Amino acid sequence: MIGMGIETSCDETSIGIVRDGKDLLSLKIFSQIDLHKPYGGIVPEIASRAHLEKINLLLEEAMEESEIQFKDLSYVAVTSSPGLTGSLMVGAQMARCIHMVYETPILPVCHLQSHFAVLHLEGVPTEFPVLGLLLSGGNSAIYILHEFGKMELLGDTMDDALGEAFDKVAGLLELPYPGGPHIEVRAKEYKPSPNEKPILPALLRNLPQEEVSFSFSGLKTAVMVLLEKQKELSKERICWNFQNSAFDLVERNLKRAVSKTGIKRIFAAGGVLANFTLQNRLYTWAEKNSVELFAPKKKIYCTDNGAMVASLGYYLFQKGYQRDIDFTVSPSRQEIFS
């Protein structure tokens, strides 16, 4: 079974073509980083315009590389929520056009759920229930995945997402946008002494033991105050301490989620997982605690892409899921829970 995935939820335009939910035939991505870099963040109007300009070309390239025809497609999955409304509409219209011409079934899917489906493109077996850790520019949350298409929120961020915090701290340090890769590089250059004390606070230490929550806005503020009071501190030291404090909270929340649910199998996904310092730390923690943890090995699978949408579509289509042409898109995360 061959399916197409269309991803335009934010600032990547992507078409993916997948066989049986796990074999990649083609993946084309246009990243808008250079378009948004002058503004230090994503500008919705620029994002939707760029999707319009690039999506047809990517579609042609994906079809050519996969050596299939539109009549070979069993379904077209498209991200319908959450995301930037104008951007989502571009992908939705492309899916509708394919449906109208070729009568290909349409599957509007949840962007957040598709991040977890991408792991099956790397051979991770499907076994439920599983904990899902999602860390990206717009999300920092832990879910219980009961099956594809059904996940339960266990803990969310109370303010900024981790990816957003990376960008904001990078801005304070006058590092380029997006901030994640630059902070990771600077942090690797710093070698703390054995008895060195943290210069940034531990996050959410006073929460009840059973509560799973994220909060990163205070960490950004702490960096701002630190820069004002101790101008002599190196960027490398600040980056190392920022990552260490943020990753402490991620690790602590995973520990609480495992304790609370008894589930010892974790899918970790989202753009922040492209930080292999974080991946290595999570794998070390998982091994020590007899937890199975899976994260994308390829950085391209951490970021938004059409292959993950196509992979999720395969499993939903197997269960009989599809929608009429008049489906709607939504910026809201609330619609995904079932």
UniProtKB/Swiss-Prot annotation:
Residues recorded as binding Fe cation, renumbered to this chain, are H111, H115, D304
Record-listed substrate binding positions:
L134, L135, S136, G137, G138, D167, G180, N275
Q: Which reaction does it catalyse?
A: L-threonylcarbamoyladenylate + adenosine(37) in tRNA = N(6)-L-threonylcarbamoyladenosine(37) in tRNA + AMP + H(+)
User: Which Gene3D superfamilies does the record associate with it?
Assistant: 3.30.420.40
Q: Where in the cell is it found?
A: Cytoplasm
**What GO molecular function terms would the record report?**
iron ion binding; N(6)-L-threonylcarbamoyladenine synthase activity
- Identify the SUPFAM superfamilies for this entry: Actin-like ATPase domain
| Pfam families listed in its UniProt record | TsaD (PF00814)
BP GO annotations = tRNA threonylcarbamoyladenosine modification
UniProt KW keywords:
Acyltransferase, Cytoplasm, Iron, Metal-binding, Transferase, tRNA processing
Per the record, GO CC terms? cytoplasm
- Principal cellular location given in the protein's record: cytoplasm
EC no.? 2.3.1.234
Q: What class of enzyme is it?
A: transferase
Q: What is this protein called?
A: tRNA N6-adenosine threonylcarbamoyltransferase
Native species of this protein?
A: Leptospira interrogans serogroup Icterohaemorrhagiae serovar Lai (strain 56601)
Which gene carries the instructions for this protein?
Answer: tsaD
